[in-house]
Design a protein with these regions (language model features):
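Conserved loop->alpha-helix
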Residues: 1-211
C-alpha cells in the first residue's frame, strides 16, 4: 500500500524486452532496498528484483504492460517513485494500492495565478468514481479532484507538486496512469446490485409518468 506522496523522481537507465514482458533498470537514490519489496513506479506497484548503488531492477509482465504506459518507457524517461507504506508512517495523501485502473489522456494544461490546472479524460465506465474534492492518484501522485468535467476531471497542482514530481512535465496529449479512490470503488461495487434491480413500484411509476 502507498500514500501517493512521491519520495523522489527516478530515471529509466535500462530497458530489456523479454518473452514474459519488460525488464527495467531505474536510477534511484535509495540506500536500503530489499530485494522483493514493493515500489510504486508512476503509480504502478512493481517488485524490486535486484538492486545496487543508486539503482534497482524490476519487471512488468504482459498484463501490466497492457494496462499501463510502461511499454512506452525508454532510457531517460523520468518516473515517480514511492516505497510501500510502513505501519508507523503518516498517511499524508490517501490510500493508494498501486493498481492502475486506466490510462488517461491529458486534455489541457493551463496556468492559473497560483497553480496549474490539468484536465484529464475519464472513460464513461469510471465517471461515477470521481466527486469534487475527492481523491485520485495520477502517475502515483495523490491529488484532489478540483472539478468534474464532461467525461473528465480537472486537477489543480501547486508549485511544490510540479517541482517534485513528473507532473510538471505534462503537456496536452500525454498519457498518465489513473487510480481511482479505493473507497469509491468498493462503495460502487456494493451498490451495483441495488442499482441494477428495479422493483415493481419502479415500473408502476414509469407507467404513471408515461400516461
Amino acid at each position: 500500500m502507498f500514500t501517493g506522496l512521491v519520495e523522489q523522481v527516478g530515471e529509466i537507465i535500462g530497458v530489456r524486452q523479454t518473452d514474459a514482458g519488460r525488464e527495467l533498470r531505474i536510477r534511484a537514490a535509495y540506500s536500503d532496498f530489499l530485494d522483493g519489496e514493493s515500489i510504486a513506479v508512476n503509480g504502478a506497484c512493481l517488485t524490486v528484483r535486484e538492486h545496487g548503488t543508486n539503482w534497482f531492477a524490476t519487471a512488468a509482465v504482459t498484463t501490466t504492460l497492457e494496462r499501463t504506459t510502461i511499454g512506452e518507457w525508454k532510457q531517460g524517461t523520468r518516473v515517480n517513485l514511492e516505497r510501500a507504506l510502513r505501519a508507523s508512517d503518516r498517511l499524508g495523501g490517501h490510500i493508494v494500492q498501486g493498481h492502475v485502473d486506466f490510462v488517461s489522456r491529458v486534455r489541457a494544461v493551463d496556468r492559473a495565478s497560483d497553480a496549474v490546472l490539468i484536465d484529464l479524460d475519464i472513460p464513461a465506465s469510471s465517471e461515477s468514481l470521481f466527486v469534487p474534492h475527492g481523491s485520485v492518484a495520477v502517475d502515483g501522485v495523490s491529488l484532489t479532484v478540483n472539478e468534474l468535467l464532461p467525461h473528465g476531471i480537472q486537477l489543480s497542482l501547486i508549485e511544490y507538486t510540479l517541482r517534485h514530481t513528473t507532473l510538471g512535465d505534462l503537456t496536452p496529449g500525454a498519457r498518465v496512469h489513473v487510480e481511482a479512490d479505493v473507497v469509491a470503488k468498493h462503495v460502487r461495487r456494493l451498490l451495483e446490485p441495488f442499482l441494477r434491480e428495479r422493483s415493481p413500484l419502479d415500473s408502476l411509476t414509469d407507467f404513471s409518468l408515461e400516461h
